[in-house]
A protein has these predicted regions:
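Positively charged n-region of N-terminal signal peptides that target proteins for export
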Residues: 1-13
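Hydrophobic residues within membrane-embedded alpha helices
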Residues: 13-14, 57
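Proteins that catalyze or organize thiol-disulfide redox chemistry
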Residues: 7, 28-70, 76-97, 110-247, ...
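Short, well-ordered alpha-helix to beta-strand connector turns
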Residues: 102-103, 246
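Bacterial N-terminal signal peptides
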Residues: 15-24
Length: 345
């Protein structure tokens, strides 16, 4: 007599088999473990930073009477660049005493909620002030003269020698008649950097009417950070992958050779760098659809640099009004996918 199973028992058997299958395959079907963030560094401001109610009109008046400039140190919790710059220049190092002698240093957290009365009399939260000042990298250093005018802003980490140039530029009030790059060029005699090649570099002299993603890298012979940029960032595999949508051009920011810039104007690399207001070498300006979409004016480690490239190359800047907003969403997505994120060098 043939063996048969009625419908009721068949359903029960299938349920048992499915339960057994889930038990055996559970690990494979389990949710992907979240990724981890490494490379963040906790930091604290030195105790000699000025205690402030963040009313910068009052701070300017005090600085004016003392004949000093104000240095606003804008940082972010667990920022490795902030920690390094504080350690090398404010907690110790040759710049420490120079800064203490000549500047009133006031800390502002770019994600903070404290109320700030800025030099123009307007009131902001710390976070809104960072947006107003277009802070795209931390630390950002904002220098204010005794008359209450912003005279220089540095977005991103600077090495101690590079920062020293900026400190002396402000203290000497050289900002009255020249740019920071011109000031450095006059002071620096012996070249610090020999230009390096890269397989992605193209020789371009006419940038007009170019509407695809374009990365223009400005370097010069006095660039203290350019060699490290090539070694640790520009040749990193993750960065090379995000460079694929870009046409990449390196220009000597001191060169006087004729070129046509992105707007169609006849100019030179020197004049173009000056018109862009670049304060750092290497200065990386990212263009798309014939206009500037983002720039990098401080040292970034490979993760943040490749995400800046993706921000423009993937045209995410069309969806997000700020890189920081894009980056927050991007990091959440990567961690959700189980990707580890390394903020370190």
């Amino acid at each position: 007599m043939p063996f048969t199973i009625d419908t009721k028992h068949m359903k029960m058997l299938m349920s048992l088999l499915f339960a057994a299958l889930l038990a055996n395959c559970g690990p494979a079907l389990a949710e992907t473990p979240a990724g981890r963030v490494t490379g963040g560094v906790a930091h604290s401001a030195p105790d000699w930073f000025k205690s402030s109610f963040l009313n910068f009109q009052d701070e300017v008046e005090e600085a004016r009477r003392a004949g000093r400039h104000i240095l606003v140190f804008m940082d972010l919790n667990d920022c490795p660049y902030c920690a390094r710059m504080l350690d090398e220049n404010f907690h110790r190092g040759e710049n420490r005493e120079y800064i203490r002698k000549n500047f009133d240093v006031i800390a502002v957290n770019v994600r903070g909620a404290q109320e700030v009365t800025w030099i123009d009399g307007a009131t902001y939260t710390e976070q809104d002030l960072a947006i107003k000042l277009k802070v795209v990298g931390t630390p950002a250093l904002v220098f204010i003269d005794p008359d209450g005018k912003k005279v220089l802003q540095l977005n991103g980490y600077r090495t101690p020698p590079t920062l020293r140039h900026a400190l002396e530029y402000v203290h000497d009030k050289a900002y009255r008649d020249q740019s920071l790059s011109a000031y450095i060029e006059k002071k620096q005699q012996a070249p610090l950097y020999t230009f390096r090649g890269h397989p992605r570099f193209e020789n371009v002299t006419d940038f007009a009417r170019y509407h695809k993603p374009l990365a223009v890298i400005f370097e010069d012979k006095n660039c203290a950070d350019c060699a490290g940029f090539h070694e640790k960032v520009l040749n990193h595999p993750d960065v090379l992958a995000e460079l694929k949508p870009f046409r990449v051009v390196r220009l000597d920011a001191y060169a006087e050779t004729p070129i046509v810039d992105i707007s169609g104007a006849r100019t030179t690399p020197r004049a173009w760098a000056a018109s862009l207001g670049l304060t750092h070498r290497p200065g990386v300006v990212l263009f798309d659809e014939g206009k500037e979409a983002a720039r990098v004016e401080g040292r970034l480690y490979h993760f943040h640099f490749k995400e800046m490239l993706r921000f423009v190359g993937g045209r995410h800047y069309q969806r997000y009004d700020r890189f920081s907003s894009y980056l927050a969403d991007r990091q959440r997505d990567l961690l959700r996918q189980g990707v580890n994120i390394d903020f370190g060098e």
